[in-house]
Regions:
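Conserved N-terminal alpha-helix of the aminotransferase class I/II PLP-enzyme fold
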Residues: 1-29, 37, 50, 283
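PLP-dependent aminotransferase-like
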Residues: 11, 29, 36-115, 119-131
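Conserved glycine-rich beta-strand-loop-beta hairpin in the small C-terminal domain of fold type I
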Residues: 28, 232-276, 280, 284-291, ...
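Active-site PLP attachment segment
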Residues: 139-176, 212, 218-219, 231
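Short hydrophobic/aromatic beta-strand micro-patches
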Residues: 161, 316-320
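Short, conserved charged micro-motifs
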Residues: 168-169, 321-328, 377-382
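Non-catalytic, alpha-helical, charged scaffold/linker segments
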Residues: 173-242
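Conserved PLP cofactor-binding pocket of PLP-dependent enzymes
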Residues: 181-188, 301-308, 322-366, 389-407
Length: 411
């Protein structure tokens, strides 16, 4: 009998995590598998509005209703204590974010889910290597989605971690039904793209390459959020659950998110996974440096001082005039991504999501956070110093205006 697709990579992750793992071409496909396996169509999923818009569309593609939770103003993750009891009584699942690798309040969320008898799903795409109470993120819920395009910069690959082998085998079959045939040309591009990025950075060509891509219209996004295309999104809802119906949104930034990559891509991912611990160590060093700056939140400084640095995917730095700073940093060969502004309820509107009952913390955090790559910590500190970047603090928070657009973005 042939081995399941990607089983060697999955076995590597199983040894690291202590849970059965299913290999997937991306974390977004892994999350979709979990949502389809445990949630009936129409189920309501509690999630943070400070999140990748792709995740919103994965939830919609699964035929579910995203319910936006109040978040902590310090880290953008769900604040369980701020979720109204009426909301808790009317949700069918909870999806964590572990934003930038900072762990969710997963012990409280797990306790709530157990009381309610609903599944807890962990989006651990940013959080390989993060721990809570001595346990790795990805081992607290019913299932957890991991990404290899973050920490090891693989441009492909992910895992769905589950509790037992029987469930793993069931999900492998569901995954196989959703995979599309791979192509050698796409596999070559997936393999070479991270090498090209590394070369651009090492040759100090980030600024000219980025500006050229902007001028030529080669960037898939013109803003922090993709165009919503609301009328098409409304029409797609009639076909949910369906990845095909939501393809134009779910594939953004990763067109091969469900391609059956061949041995070339999987071989490269195996090499990159072998260097994961080295990557995590470098990230901890960068987090230590950035946590000691004025732009780090007190919560991050305290966590680093008492528990040691986390191997964050990005370090959320709190700054004034963030959008202008993003443009200025390109002059210092620093391109900032993973900015999730505006929050999903302001972005999508009440037709597609249930808005948060307290949107102010999410709006403040989303507007003031600059996600800093800890692998570039020294360069970023130098750039911030030269640019005289002012730190922001939520204690200065004034009433945040309702920034919901008069019509849905993308219409």
């Amino acid at each position: 009998m042939p081995m399941p697709y990607g089983s060697r990579l999955a076995a590597t992750m199983t040894r690291r995590l202590g849970r059965e793992c299913v290999y997937t071409p991306s974390a977004r496909l892994a999350l979709y598998l979990a949502l389809r396996r445990w949630c009936r169509p129409g189920a309501r999923v509690l999630m943070s509005p400070v999140n990748d818009d792709v995740i919103l569309f994965v939830v919609l593609a699964a035929g579910l209703r995203p319910v936006q939770a109040p978040v902590s103003v310090w880290d953008g993750n769900i604040d369980p204590a701020a979720v109204p009891e009426s909301t808790w009584r009317n949700v069918d699942a909870v999806l964590t974010t572990n934003l930038y690798g900072v762990p969710d309040r997963v012990l409280e969320l797990r306790r709530r889910c157990e009381q309610l008898g609903i599944p807890l799903f962990e989006d651990a795409a940013h959080a390989i290597g993060s721990h809570v109470d001595g346990r790795p993120i990805g081992t607290f819920g019913k299932a957890a989605a991991f990404s290899l395009s973050k920490h090891v910069a693989g441009m492909a690959g992910g895992f769905l971690a589950v509790e037992d082998a029987r469930t793993r085998r069931e999900l492998e079959l569901l995954r196989d039904d959703l995979l599309t045939p791979g192509r050698l040309r796409e596999d070559l591009a997936t393999t070479l793209r991270p090498l090209a990025r590394s070369a651009v950075r090492s040759l100090h060509l980030v600024r000219p390459v980025w500006r050229t891509m902007e001028r030529l219209g080669l960037l898939e996004r013109d803003a922090f959020r993709m165009d919503l295309h609301a009328p098409r999104l409304t029409a797609s809802a009639r076909e949910a659950p369906s990845l095909t119906a939501y393809e134009r949104w779910v594939r953004v930034d990763l067109h091969g998110y469900r391609s059956r990559h061949g041995s070339l891509v999987r071989g490269q991912l195996k090499l990159r996974m072998a260097r994961l611990d080295e990557d995590l160590a470098r990230r901890r060093a960068g987090v230590t440096l950035l946590a000691g700056t004025p732009w780090a939140s007190p919560a991050l400084r305290d966590r680093t001082a008492h528990d040691g640095p986390l191997p964050l995917f990005r370090v959320p730095l709190l700054v004034h005039d963030r959008d202008a700073l993003v443009q200025r940093l390109v002059r210092h060969d620093v391109v900032c991504g993973y900015i999730y502004d505006p929050p999903l309820d302001d972005y999508a509107g009440a037709e597609f999501v249930e808005p948060s009952p307290d949107p102010a913390p999410a709006r403040w955090f989303a507007a003031h956070t600059l996600p800093a790559d800890p692998l570039l910590a020294r360069r970023i500190v130098g750039a911030f110093t030269k640019e005289r970047v002012a730190d922001a603090h939520p204690s200065l928070l004034r009433p945040v205006p309702d920034v919901t657009p008069p019509r849905l973005l993308g219409q």
